[in-house]
Amino acid sequence: MLCAIYKSPKKEGMYLYVEKRDKFEAVPLELRQIFGKPEFVMLFNLAGEKQLKRVDNQEVLQKIQKEGFYLQMPPPPENLHAEFVARQKGLK
């Protein structure tokens, strides 16, 4: 199954997957407002050999079939300070 992938102009790392290009009827209005005007990234074959980088193809496929869309949230921000402190404690 092909799906269309869009990125959010408002939130870096947020992506929206829909069954057909430019078909956003299944996406709730409030979510569309938060997401902003979708910027087309590409078409992707969820049943193909390639895997998505941050999400499971099957999970995306199931959500699209059930809800009409899949929303990929940005990864949590790295806490570099906490990582630095943890490394310093390990070195002492």
Swiss-Prot record:
Residue ranges of every copy of the YcgL domain listed in the record: 1-85
What Gene3D superfamilies does the annotation carry?
A: YcgL domain (3.10.510.20)
* Any Pfam family the entry gives: YcgL
Q: Which InterPro entries match?
A: YcgL-like_sf, YcgL_dom
Quote the HAMAP family the UniProt record gives: UPF0745
Q: PANTHER family recorded for this chain?
A: PROTEIN YCGL
Q: What is this protein called?
A: YcgL domain-containing protein HAPS_0171
| Source organism per UniProt | Glaesserella parasuis serovar 5 (strain SH0165) (Haemophilus parasuis)
